[in-house]
């Protein structure tokens, strides 16, 4: 359950034959329009993000701070039908609005996530497109990068503790992989990409599903490292997770 937030503002808009709305943080943005979500409107202040993901993301140097713009794109077989359109099920169930509100709820629970700034959808017929604008985390490296460079020296224990903290708060992360776990220069961990994430009562089944997905991600990204080495690193992560979970954080 995500609570009501009085600092949210909603702005409807029309574009071509479609209509949509923008949900934004009025403490950070005085107003919002559709140009916020167009890389072309930012010109040379927007540059593509090339690490992980399916594309459709840009670093933006905005007047309100360094940001990341992400357009929601499909992967796998679904992308053959439509790369960027989703079935309309109501404004509150759009991918962008749901992720925006989930991130704000996680921040209220004092969890380390980037601050969402604005989310939009544009509905046309039975489908819609969506995008999300959020603050950019500076001077961070993903767990994937740490693993490739440092191997056994990567922050395995810190990663396990970080995940346990989010799980204790009830976050079921839909795509927990090594690209979505970041560490800043001070060694502080962050999670990103909460698309399709939900808050649940903590339970073993979905927690282990998250962890197994991360394990598969590490194996996929192992490069020249042996599976045995990756499994040993993951075992360190999992032990730290279990210890942190047992302590209640």
From Swiss-Prot:
Reactions this protein catalyses: an alpha-Kdo-(2->6)-lipid IVA + ATP = a 4-O-phospho-alpha-Kdo-(2->6)-lipid IVA + ADP + H(+)
- Where is it located? Cell inner membrane
Q: Which keywords does the record carry?
A: ATP-binding, Cell inner membrane, Cell membrane, Kinase, Lipopolysaccharide biosynthesis, Membrane, Nucleotide-binding, Transferase
Give GO BP annotations, semicolon-separated.
lipopolysaccharide core region biosynthetic process
Q: Which InterPro entries match?
A: KDO_kinase (IPR022826), Kinase-like_dom_sf (IPR011009)
Q: Does the keyword Transmembrane apply?
A: no
State a single Pfam family of this protein. Answer: Kdo
Annotated GO molecular function terms are: ATP binding; kinase activity; phosphotransferase activity, alcohol group as acceptor
Active site, renumbered: 175
Give the bilayer topology: Peripheral membrane protein
Question: For this UniProt entry, what is the primary localization, expressed as one broad class?
Answer: membrane
Q: In which pathway does it act?
A: Bacterial outer membrane biogenesis; LPS core biosynthesis
KW Transferase (keyword) present: yes
GO cellular component, alphabetical, reads:
plasma membrane
Do you know which HAMAP family this protein is assigned to? KDO_kinase (MF_00521)
Function in brief:
Catalyzes the ATP-dependent phosphorylation of the 3-deoxy-D-manno-octulosonic acid (Kdo) residue in Kdo-lipid IV(A) at the 4-OH position.
Protein's name in the database: 3-deoxy-D-manno-octulosonic acid kinase
Name the lineage: Bacteria, Pseudomonadati, Pseudomonadota, Gammaproteobacteria, Lysobacterales
Q: Which gene encodes it?
A: kdkA
């Amino acid at each position: 359950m995500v609570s009501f937030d009085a600092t949210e503002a909603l702005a409807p808009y029309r574009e071509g034959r479609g209509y949509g709305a923008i949900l934004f943080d009025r403490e950070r943005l005085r107003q919002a329009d559709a140009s916020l979500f167009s890389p072309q409107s930012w010109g040379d202040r927007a540059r593509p993000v090339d690490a992980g993901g399916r594309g459709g993301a840009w670093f933006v140097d905005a007047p309100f701070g360094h940001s990341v713009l992400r357009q929601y794109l499909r992967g796998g077989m679904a992308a053959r039908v439509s790369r960027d359109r989703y079935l309309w099920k109501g404004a509150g169930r759009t991918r962008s609005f749901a992720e925006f509100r989930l991130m704000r709820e996680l921040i209220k629970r004092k969890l380390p996530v980037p601050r969402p700034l604005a989310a939009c959808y544009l509905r046309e017929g039975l489908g819609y497109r969506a995008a999300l604008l959020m603050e950019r985390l500076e001077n961070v490296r993903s767990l994937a990068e740490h693993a490739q460079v440092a191997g056994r020296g990567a922050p395995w224990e810190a990663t396990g503790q970080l995940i346990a903290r989010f799980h204790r708060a009830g976050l079921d992360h839909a795509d927990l992989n090594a690209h979505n776990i970041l560490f800043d220069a001070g060694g502080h961990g962050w999670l990103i990409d909460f698309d399709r994430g939900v808050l649940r009562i903590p339970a073993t089944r979905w927690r282990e599903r998250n962890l197994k997905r991360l394990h598969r991600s590490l194996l996929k990204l192992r490069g020249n490292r042996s599976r045995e080495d990756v499994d040993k690193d993951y075992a360190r992560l999992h032990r730290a997770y279990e210890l942190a979970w047992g302590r209640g954080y």
